[in-house]
Amino acid sequence: MKKLYDAVQRFCARHPRFGIPNLMLYIVAGNVIVYLLMMFTQANDANALAFLTLNTSAVLKGELWRIITYVFVPTSSGIFWLLISLYFYYWIGSTLERQWGTAKFNLYYISGVLLTAVGVLIASLISGQSYTVAGSYYVNLSMFFAFAFLFPDTQVLLFFIIPVKMKWLAYLDGALFAYDVVRCLMAGNWGGALLPIIALLNFAVFIWPEVHYMA
């Protein structure tokens, strides 16, 4: 992991202009546009945006755009919670970009997107079933863990009332993440257990070595 981490650091130092500045603004805008298309076309059923989701069988048939477009599928069908989640992850992502620089943040986000695709492929090969991912849940979770590591004492209002530090929310999400993995393993669902682990490998590459540097 340390060698990969050092390679990332060198790349970012040599190519500081790599990537798309304010990337999260485009991700948020894409989610809003897709949501509006759903609303105006009354395409609210589960199959309406099937051409955007990350599906193993479809990708292997040449529909390579799905490797990227799945992150634009809204994670919530309710406008209120969609706007709240988009604002929250825009805040997290833009803060990480200011902290790391555009190059490193773009690498982190893009690697999360691609690792999720790799995880879906491996899970499908192991299980013999075609996995589908709609929305950027794992990418967002990876961003959240990175933010909580860098800014553990930052407070947010849980349910708009209760002040909670990011590190405690990260511990809770980490516990739920581990529970889901263990539950899949106990059920013999090896693909379902590997998918989230592979999807969050960018956290291990970008963040975990910093734990040792800080120790």
Language model regions located:
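C-terminal transmembrane module of polytopic alpha-helical membrane proteins
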Residues: M1-I20, L121, A175-A215
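N-terminal TM1-TM2 helical hairpin plus the immediately adjacent luminal interfacial "cap"
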Residues: C12, P16-V113, A117-V118, S124, ...
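Hydrophobic alpha-helical transmembrane segments of polytopic
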Residues: M24-V34, Y109-G112, F145, L169-L176, ...
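Aromatic-anchored segments of alpha-helical transmembrane domains
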Residues: V32, L36-L37, V113-L121, A148, ...
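Hydrophobic core segments of alpha-helical transmembrane domains in multi-pass membrane proteins
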Residues: L83-F88, S136-F145, I161, G191-P209
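Generic alpha-helical transmembrane segments
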Residues: T116-A117, A134-P152
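A cytosolic-side transmembrane-helix exit/cap motif
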Residues: G128-Y131, Q155-I162, Y213-A215
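Membrane-helix boundary/juxtamembrane motif in polytopic membrane proteins
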Residues: D153-D173
